[in-house]
Amino acid sequence: MGLQQEISLQPWCHHPAESCQTTTDMTERLSAEQIKEYKGVFEMFDEEGNGEVKTGELEWLMSLLGINPTKSELASMAKDVDRDNKGFFNCDGFLALMGVYHEKAQNQESELRAAFRVFDKEGKGYIDWNTLKYVLMNAGEPLNEVEAEQMMKEADKDGDRTIDYEEFVAMMTGESFKLIQ
């Protein structure tokens, strides 16, 4: 991630200083630009200007940032930001949540790159159709042939019968897989 400068949240917080203290974890996980962006979105939902957002608004707030968690992920996030179950959370809780989110996203990215390299042993930048089909039908929770082909067709956006890294990520994260049931 490189050298990060110490970031103070004070300039972006309009509520009592004691509820907006920077933690080292936040400064390591989020850039100044990210903090500014997230603080701006947080303030849009802070209807009363008191530095608090209703926990029920978390889904809309995340959606505005392009993050669409599942219901169970959302429930877990709500517990994390509203530990006292008061029905609201402050900017520090939200920024800490976003720091954790970014850390998990980075970990997932490195895991996906490593998995892709396992299948792209020759470093061609893609996985051929037959290799991927074999893996999908024989590893983990195996798919049947129809399911494997459907999944690959959804993932192979350019129709070249290979799966490049971007297509692989979309397939593995469920962004392209819509199995017809």
Swiss-Prot record:
Ranges in coiled-coil conformation: none
One GO cellular component, as annotated: nucleus
InterPro entries: CALM/Myosin/TropC-like, EF-hand-dom_pair, EF_Hand_1_Ca_BS, EF_hand_dom
Keywords (A to Z) from UniProt: Calcium, Cytoplasm, Metal-binding, Nucleus, Repeat
Annotated ranges, domain EF-hand: 33-68, 69-104, 107-142, 143-178
rRNA processing keyword on record: no
Subcellular location: Cytoplasm; Nucleus
One Pfam family hit: EF-hand_7
Tissue: Expressed in prostate, thymus, heart, skeleton muscle, bone marrow and ovary.
Primary subcellular site in the record, as a coarse category: cytoplasm
GO biological process, one term: microtubule cytoskeleton organization
Keyword Transcription regulation: no
Entry similarity comment: Belongs to the calmodulin family. Calglandulin subfamily.
Name this polypeptide is given: Calmodulin-like protein 6
Organism (species): Homo sapiens
